[in-house]
Each structure stands twice: as C-alpha cells, then as structure tokens.
C-alpha cells in the first residue's frame, strides 16, 4: 500500500453537472449535494485521503438504481455503491467525483424460507438486522465481520469474519443475487437451488467485485440453524507460536470449532482496558464451539488438553450466553480498542491470509518487523483459516511515519504472497492494495481487465479500484 499507488480518475465536469440536475429532479429530497453528506459518503476509516462524490442518491428500488446508472452512463459519470461505509481499503472513495448510491433505504427482508434454510434480502439490510429478524425462526446468518456491515457491501467485498472456519465466507453463503450492470440492465445470477452447473458462475464473479462491475440490489443467502448449545472461552499462551501450534492441532484433529481467534499480547492489552476483560496480557486464543450440550462440552475439554500440550492454559470456558457475548463483543470492538493505544493516531488497517501451516511463521515475522521498525501495531487473526489483521497506528501528518507504515505493509503483503497466500483475506483490494494484485495473480489481472472492459466499457462503475491504471 502506498498513497502513490492510488489511481487518478479524470473528472467529467460537464457530465457531472448534467447528472446532478437529472437526479435532483427525479429523486427530490432523496438526492443530496451538501458538503457534510458528501464527505460522509467518502472513505474515512483509515489514512487514505477522503475523495468525496458530487452527490448522494438514496434509491428505494432496483428500478431507481437502474435510472441512476443509466443517467450516469449517458453522461459518463462515475457511480460508487455505498452500504454503511465500514470498508477499509478506500472502496467508497470517489476519485473522479460522480454519484454515491446509498442503499440504506433498500433495507427490506423480501423472503425467509425456513425449510430451505435461505432468505432473500435487499442490500441495505445489515447482518445484525437480519439476525434479529430471524431469531424467532431458529435460524441465523453466520458471517460476522467486525462492523455491522450491510449485506450488499459484505458480498461486494467478499467479506468473512470470526465464524469463517466453520461456516465459510460470503462466497460460500450467497446462493444468487440481482445486480444493476453498467448499462442499467439487471442480471439475476441464479435460483435458490443449493447447487447448479448452469453456465458461468456469475454469482461468484460479482461477489468480491467491489462495485466495479455492477451494483447489487438483492441477495439470496444461506442460513444455518441456531445451535442447541454454544460454549466458548479464552486460553492464554506463552507465545504466538505455541498458540498457532494449538490451532493447527485442533484443526487436524477434526474438532468442529466454530471460532478460533488469535489475539497477540498488545491487542490483548488494548482489549482488556477498552472492554474490561480480566485475562492475561499474553497471546490468547478466543474459541467457540457449536453443537449439542454434550458435544460442546467434549470439544471444549479436548481443546483444553490440546492447549495444555502446547504450553497454554488454563482454558476457561463457559456456556453462559452473557459471558460469551461480552467476550465476542470485545473481539468485534478490536479496531476501536486498538485506537486507544495511541490517542489521536489514525489506523492503517491491513489483512493477509496464508496457508495455516505458514500462519505462525507469518505472524512471528510480522511481529519482528513491528519491533524492528518501532511501530505500534496490534495483531488479531482468524487463526482457523490463516487470516490475520494488523492495525498500524500512525500520525498521518508525519510523512516519515506514513512512509514507514507503508513500507511495513508492503513487506507484510509480499511475505504473505511468497508463502503462497494472499495480500487480502477479506478486506478486498479497493484503492489500498492495487499495487500488490499483479504480484499475486500475474496474468490473471489482464483477464480481470478484459472482463471489466467488456461489462463496463465506459469505466463508470467505481473507477480507480482493484485494477492498476485505468
């Protein structure tokens, strides 16, 4: 990541002026151009500079999204989809200006099919909204990124979360979707069948496309039954390597762990102070098991023995819902707790993912880099699938700190790629990781560019993201 890697996008002043007039007339108060609301719809969660759109539209239907996109296509004006703005790599920035399409009013749950374990929702529904709605059905949607993100945004970035080791990512949990493409036409990528061999997999093409190919306007999602019993707890370890070895042993023994999260010592200190946890300031694993009463108790006991064999413990676990909720709220608040380690600093949040056999090595080398460079950068990770996050705290007004932080992130990304991993497990490419995509995928980037040019020949759909250059 480097600010110098950000793709410049030329502004089309004449086209923008025309579209502003068209959308104001069509949407009335649901089209806003005030400075405050435009700034809110640019990227603000990390150090990438804010690049505001020229207007913000609040459509309520797929047909209105089509109208917006057609107007923008006619005048060659950029269109940037916006959910709740929780993405971390500059996805919602508008480097060439244009229109931000805020999907928050498209927040209906269109259908729930309990017997089929699926539901269909609009993109503005958040994961917490959906799970509140599902509570009385005995079902839940398991994907849980740290933020209460919109489901449309989660699909667009191919998000995952703490449950991915058991339930997968958005890639595995979206059955089909409807999207408005760059010409204003809609495409529905599939039916509700649990599997299909019918042609190209357009669902997977659009999942993770970050709004660069189309704007998602509905999704059909897989659901899971709420487990009969849940147990979970925290286990301290003398070091990161011991914790990672316990993770590998747990996975290899076939224990159906639902969550297994690594928190390094610095992150644990931040979480203790911010979330009032009473655990040691040492590397810890946050673990959870789903199943029957007998099953989760047996799994917890077995994990405790594995932890002890690797120098960890004691594993303190509970089946009390309130205690587990406090634990996982602290985990989901890790970003905010990290910021307290250096008040006033901005966070450069990054993530990588490596094969689980290289996870300990990657984390330990990263910690060595942090120490060598004198950075304040806590680590937290989805240890069960080899994915971890680093939040580098820095003074964004100090060019030397920015350069040092960017150097660190570059070394981390290249290390992950060299280990046969990826420069991003779940944040996406956006603006921040464009410079690493070719290192990871080589000629695959050229094929992506061909797809982009075929589906969006005017380059109006979230330009300046994913692909190097324009």
Range-by-range predicted roles:
Residues 185, 434-470:
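Activity-critical C-terminal alpha-helical subdomain
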Residues 33-41, 225, 231, 236-408, ...:
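C-terminal substrate-recognition/cap domain of FAD-linked oxidoreductases
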Residues 29, 417-429, 442, 457-461:
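Alpha-helix capping/hinge segments and adjacent helical runs
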Residues 108-261, 461:
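FAD-binding subdomain of flavoenzyme oxidoreductases
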Residues 1-70, 86-117, 265-275, 321-349, ...:
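N-terminal flexible segment immediately upstream of the FAD-binding catalytic core
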